[in-house]
Amino acid sequence: MTHTLYYKFILGYLLFGFLGFVTIATVSSNLTYEHLIEQKAEALYDEATMIADNCSKVYEGKYLDLATAYPQLDAVATYMKARIWIMDHSGIITADSSRKAAGTAVEGFDPTAQGNRLYTIGRYYGMFDSDVLSVSSPITGNMNTYGYITIHLPISVIKAEQNGFLNIVYITSGIIFALSLIILLIF
């Protein structure tokens, strides 16, 4: 009688560990990913808005030299692990933080496609080989929209950060699971 109860207890313990791992792998993974997407989108949008405000000063009579703007774009892009584009209203990239796409036209560019969402996820009109998180902010002046600041963060960067968080959760749950072995020692 005691052995069968003990085996059932061990089986229940192992089942609990397995279901805990599956729960962490699915629920925690999705929650972490969604949280990181929202967090990164807000940070990118704030940065895009700040850059757009600086670019808008040109239309208030102030001078903006692209030669002096590039180091700032490059520094922000490097810090955020993203690419920053300055685009005109028709979708032609006038400046690129990586200096690869300047002068390129974004085919099918539609600034209203984003709707009221803060961000989009995809390949941004086929301009990237993998999915990116993209945000854009208009460059306005004198009640007109002259262009857009778009910032693109590779989803792989977000996935790497997600995996880092999940590793911490896995290790912590493994330690808790191991510490709960004390219950088996008591019986």
Which residues make up each language-model segment?
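Juxtamembrane segments flanking the first transmembrane helix
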Residues: 2-92, 98-101, 160, 167
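Amphipathic alpha-helical bundle/coiled-coil segments
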Residues: 84, 133-136, 152
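A short beta-strand signature within small-molecule sensing/ligand-binding domains used
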Residues: 128-140, 147
